[in-house]
From Swiss-Prot:
Keyword Signal: yes
Topological type in the membrane: Multi-pass membrane protein
Domain of life: Bacteria
Catalytic residues in the record: Y320
Family as reported in the entry's similarity comment: Belongs to the short-chain dehydrogenases/reductases (SDR) family.
Gene encoding the protein: MgdE
Catalytic activity: a 1,2-diacyl-3-O-(beta-D-glucopyranosyl)-sn-glycerol = a 1,2-diacyl-3-O-(beta-D-galactosyl)-sn-glycerol
Name by which UniProt lists this protein: Monoglucosyldiacylglycerol epimerase
GO molecular function: racemase and epimerase activity, acting on carbohydrates and derivatives
Chief location: membrane
Function: Involved in the biosynthesis of galactolipids found in the photosynthetic membranes. Catalyzes the isomerization of monoglucosyldiacylglycerol (GlcDG) to yield monogalactosyldiacylglycerol (MGDG).
Length: 410
């Protein structure tokens, strides 16, 4: 009996997931196939940037031209789970067939709510159109479930990304869960191996890359036919306030700078390791988070922090490990109340000035980081060590839980 219940529950959840995948694929297809976009385009005409409605007439038409056809497509494809269950088990297992029909029942809810909004039923939009409600955003874009902040970006950040309606799985698979096109992204430690490689990759993705470096040289990237100089800002540890104007201007801050004192353990080495690897990064984070003020900022501003694989594994440089672990824990703490997305880059040994004997190439690591970002991974692990893929998520979960239980918001 228990097995039958579990099988029924599994079929019901699978059928709901199936129609959600159908909806998101239909949406993505509408942005590349003009006959569908002629219908879907009405949806993009409805809202102002604060999600207020331009016109009640256009709002109602958009549901007849976009939402109702979308729900009908979901309903048509939703017949497959119960049909396949019938072919597999026969009609004698009708409870399983009913369970596999959950996706159709789920879709009927969307169809009826779309019709209600299309005919202008009072309060139908407030009850059923949750991702389009106006008002201030209370949370950053969610990683797995589509919230208002996440969906706002489809309308006003990049309409060729953020296609998902309820679950973000299709965007993660397509690499459209975060658009880098046109984003101003500043990278500290830009003169290092990974910093230069990441700037190159971001430039190729259509981002406006900005180098923040303590070196006096202008940073360049390789274009289609020539070397292109990019905007380079000079900065020294302890002078983070000088970057205030830049931090207010950019969309993404990548905290990538660091120092490795190797086997040293004297007082000066301790101070240098923590000042560069931990405290300067924290000051930059605080300055950047203070610039997150509007709905657009909450939706599009981000911090990426290179905390290193040293968070959970030995790096054979104790002070490097200690300072990076401290940074990692501070980032975990800041995430609890952050007004914008904060990502961790957990990178294994790659060739750089800090690690001349690294195994991976900085260019390859940068490509994997960008792929992870576009899949909206909040913890991007790039390493050759399989232990990290297990140890880091476990550590991050329990440390975050501990901080949540024993700290409180100011």
């Amino acid at each position: 009996m228990a097995m039958a219940w579990l099988m029924g529950l599994g079929l019901a959840l699978a059928s709901v997931l199936w129609v959600e995948l159908v909806r998101d694929c239909y949406h993505a297809l509408a942005h590349v196939w003009s006959p569908l976009y002629r219908l879907h385009g009405w949806h993009h005409r409805v809202f102002r940037s604060d999600l207020s409605v331009v016109s009640t007439e256009i709002y109602q038409k958009a549901h007849w031209y976009n939402d109702v056809p979308e729900a009908l497509v979901m309903l048509a494809f939703g017949i497959w789970p119960p049909l396949l269950t019938w072919m597999w088990q026969g009609f004698s297992q009708w409870p399983l067939i009913l369970a596999a029909s959950a996706g159709m029942v789920y879709t009927l809810g969307f169809l009826l709510s779309a019709i209600a909004r299309g005919v202008g039923l009072p309060n139908a939009d407030e009850i059923t159109d949750l991702t389009h409600r106006p008002g201030p955003f209370l949370t950053p874009p969610a990683p797995w479930m589509v919230n208002r902040t996440y969906h706002w970006r489809h309308h006003f950040d990049d309409p060729n990304a953020y296609f998902c309606g309820t679950l973000t799985l299709v965007d993660k698979m397509l690499g459209t869960a975060l658009s880098l096109k046109g984003k101003k992204i500043a990278v500290t430690g830009a003169s290092g191996g990974f910093g230069q490689a990441l700037l190159q990759e971001l430039h190729q993705q259509g981002a406006k890359a900005i180098a923040i470096t303590s070196c006096g040289q202008e940073v360049t990237v390789i274009g289609a036919e020539k070397t292109i100089p990019i905007r380079t800002e000079q900065w020294c540890i302890g002078q983070e306030d000088q970057l205030k104007d830049l931090l207010a201007e950019i969309d993404v801050l990548v905290i990538n700078h660091g120092v490795n004192v190797h086997q040293r353990r004297d007082g000066q080495a301790i101070q240098e390791a923590y000042e560069v690897n931990t405290f300067s990064a924290l000051r930059l984070m605080e300055l950047f988070l203070a610039t997150v003020k509007t709905n657009r900022h909450i939706a599009t501003k981000e911090i990426w922090v290179n905390t290193s694989e040293a968070e959970v594994n030995p790096a054979f440089s104790p002070l490097y490990e200690l300072s990076k672990r401290a940074l990692g824990d501070v980032v975990t703490l800041k995430r609890l109340d952050s007004p914008c997305v904060i990502r961790k880059l957990i990178l294994g040994p790659f060739k750089s000035k800090l690690n001349p004997v690294g195994i991976m190439s900085a260019a390859w690591v940068a490509r994997q980081v960008v792929k992870g970002v576009k899949r909206d991974s909040r913890n991007i692990i790039v390493t050759i060590n399989p232990i990290t893929f297990i140890a880091f998520p476990v550590k991050e979960f329990f440390v975050s839980l501990y901080f949540r239980c024993f700290t409180k918001k100011s």
